[in-house]
Amino acid sequence: MSSPEISIKLKRLDHGAGLPLPAYATAHAAGLDVVSAEDVTLAPGARHAVATGFAIAIPEGYEVQVRPRSGLALKHGVTCLNTPGTIDADYRGEVKVILANLGSEPFEVKRGERIAQLVPAAVQRAAFAEVSDLDETARGAGGFGSTGR
């Protein structure tokens, strides 16, 4: 069963001319591939907010998550920081992807190269209720590997 498709408005910026719009690579892909609108070289250990050449208007009640591409991470040590990054429904600036080179060699990002995936997701709002005590659980305060490696 698939979720209903939502419509996201996209404004192409001047430096995004000629680039493909975000698109699914396969029929069952969860993320839309997004490409770079600029050439940039990432030195080992460097990071850069890579331009995509577009801005979007996400419907209220949704966000768009920015996620890394597994091939870039495995083959080159290049990944997205702040993952998943969240693009809020009220943001109207250019979508940028924070890439980091965790590898040992410089990595060249070419204009038009796929750099990340965008995954639209419904947002569940919450309100915190301050209490004096929390209910007990078997796990308790254990975290950061307390349930295994």
Curated annotation (Swiss-Prot):
A GO term, aspect molecular function: magnesium ion binding
Membrane-spanning segments: none
Keyword Signal: no
GO BP field: dUMP biosynthetic process; dUTP catabolic process
Residue runs in coiled coils: none
Cofactors: Mg(2+)
Residues involved in substrate binding: R69, S70, G71, N82, T86, I87, D88, K96
Pathway given in the UniProt record: Pyrimidine metabolism; dUMP biosynthesis; dUMP from dCTP (dUTP route): step 2/2
The protein's Enzyme Commission number: 3.6.1.23
Catalytic function, reaction form: dUTP + H2O = dUMP + diphosphate + H(+)
Keyword set, alphabetical order: Hydrolase, Magnesium, Metal-binding, Nucleotide metabolism
Function: This enzyme is involved in nucleotide metabolism: it produces dUMP, the immediate precursor of thymidine nucleotides and it decreases the intracellular concentration of dUTP so that uracil cannot be incorporated into DNA.
PANTHER family linked to this entry: DEOXYURIDINE 5'-TRIPHOSPHATE NUCLEOTIDOHYDROLASE (PTHR11241:SF0)
Family, per entry: Belongs to the dUTPase family.
Identification of the protein by name: Deoxyuridine 5'-triphosphate nucleotidohydrolase
Biological source species: Rhizorhabdus wittichii (strain DSM 6014 / CCUG 31198 / JCM 15750 / NBRC 105917 / EY 4224 / RW1)
Gene this chain is encoded by: dut
